[in-house]
């Protein structure tokens, strides 16, 4: 019997999806065939994953709650039935994809099985309930190990046709040396302050490190880029807050290096093979161990830190970040 493999991941954050790419690829390699994905539309996965040979097709589902719960379940049922999947792998603990699999009569429904999800799986090989304490990447790693699926490379990688992206976003193609600052985050407590990015830019500019800086930021936090530009009063900033992911990728791929908060674009930059520096103060660098991100932390930083106060980001100074970068550039 021919196998038809679907992998479902329900989280909306870009960074979380990027962390799952090695596990998606490992499942594809295990079956020696490309796989289908079901993801949230907010990830813009169809734009960023279209050049990955291990991915066949991507469908979107919003995985909503409340009155939309069952609407989205039956959307999943429809996708499953249309594609006649033999296997559905779920890379998080959400019940919805497993329930839809049961309704569709899928023979192999595989997932972490944490909480109620285990009721709807077709296997007893699951994580234990204490594994919810693991981060999403470690949960997926353990799930694959339990099912004897080899993970050949734990580091996320993205293959992008940069020529195509450059053509779409030609307004970002400034002449000269460019770097990128990732200035926002989904969680405010992870964000370095605007005036500190301004000071870092001044220090780097004195050393002729760049001609322009791309400011990478989501549209919902465009006030951050505006504030940086207003404080600085310099014309070397390029505001990318209105750009979609193709624009963000264009900016990052045309940068010599990336410096930014612990957020999706930082993970994206590392996956794109750009030298990437993460400003880590209030959260754990151990969560990012399967990454090529270089961490910049304040003095006396302790790993597995969980601080939910943005003011603590002030403990990492522009001078410290500049000195770290300067040492790396020697």
Where are these regions (language model features)?
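Catalytic machinery of carbohydrate-active enzymes
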Residues: 1-330
